[in-house]
Amino acid sequence: MSVNYEQVNVAPLVLLSVLDHYKRMNTPDNKRCVGVLLGDNSGSTIKVTNSFALPFEEDEKNPDVWFLDHNYIENMNDMCKKINAKEKMIGWYHSGPKLRSSDLKINGLFKKYTQGNSLLLIVDVKQQGVGLPTDAYMAIEEVKDDGSSTERTFVHLPTAIEAEEAEEIGVEHLLRDVRDQAAGNLSLRLTNQLKSLQGLQRKLRDIVAYLDKVNSGQLPANHIILGKLQDVFNLLPNLGSPDEEAPATKKDDVLASSNTLQKALTVKTNDELMVIYISNLMRAIIAFDNLIENKIKNKKLQEAKRDPEPEEATKEEIQQQESAKA
């Protein structure tokens, strides 16, 4: 069974509310906080626009023991409907940072209040790495390949941070105070690229760890995940050498691919350096041409300042000659 949603868009206000909730109830035990998500799930994209906190208690030793105030949920939901009738209860959140064994049971409880399947949003309030601090999940009935009975499990949904115009203005105002004003555009671009590469490296490590667990039998093979990984591998460029004959050994194949990649990178680098060289050459020629024009203008101005005196003298001589003729 699959879900009918493609993506989950989370408003920045929700992230700020979750962080404020965690900071207010933070204890030495670092217990997780739980709350309700409000928004719209009528389309193919779930929009999470608001949230409110819930009183929640659980036993750390026994994950099956937990407490939620049902009356509080119903009263808060009724009050939120009076403020904005378009926002409805679509799921719940907790501060994670990972899934827990009791999440399926808690999700089943929230399913009674939501129209359709309940959304679980995990917000990592202490994220150390790069990337979005959110993970969205939906509970589905997983059909096993061996024909045994189905069981409920969570399926991951991609998330994105999306804000309205008013929220964007507020977020930009906050980032202006947080951002280092001394840092230039180049340093910011390099920092963003470095963070992107670090996030890519972290994702690749997660993929390798998952495949190792599947290979060792610790996790069952999920054909949907394997199919998506195969699609990613199919998008990779072919670094082999089509001009050469098939190498005799695998080592020779690797060397041929490495040489082809090195050649491609060298050609691309040379092209970029050639563009930079031509651009600098054109800039120097334009500057030299402007310098020549400036020298010519200055010379003409200096000559114009000296020429008026003889011109006036010439006019006086012409007048004297005309008077003499008369």
UniProtKB/Swiss-Prot annotation:
Gene Ontology terms: cellular component: mitotic spindle midzone; proteasome complex; proteasome regulatory particle, lid subcomplex; proteasome storage granule
Region of interest (Disordered), ranges: 299-326
Listed InterPro entries: EIF3F/CSN6-like_C, JAMM/MPN+_dom, MPN, MPN_RPN7_8
UniProt keyword annotations, A-Z: Proteasome
Molecular function in Gene Ontology: metallopeptidase activity
GO biological process terms, semicolon-separated: proteasome-mediated ubiquitin-dependent protein catabolic process
Top-level lineage group: Eukaryota
MPN domain: residues covered: 8-143
Family (UniProt): Belongs to the peptidase M67A family.
PANTHER family: 26S PROTEASOME NON-ATPASE REGULATORY SUBUNIT 7, EUKARYOTIC TRANSLATION INITIATION FACTOR 3 SUBUNIT F-RELATED
Function: Acts as a regulatory subunit of the 26S proteasome which is involved in the ATP-dependent degradation of ubiquitinated proteins.
Protein name: 26S proteasome regulatory subunit RPN8
Originating organism: Eremothecium gossypii (strain ATCC 10895 / CBS 109.51 / FGSC 9923 / NRRL Y-1056)
Taxonomic lineage of the native organism: Eukaryota, Fungi, Dikarya, Ascomycota, Saccharomycotina
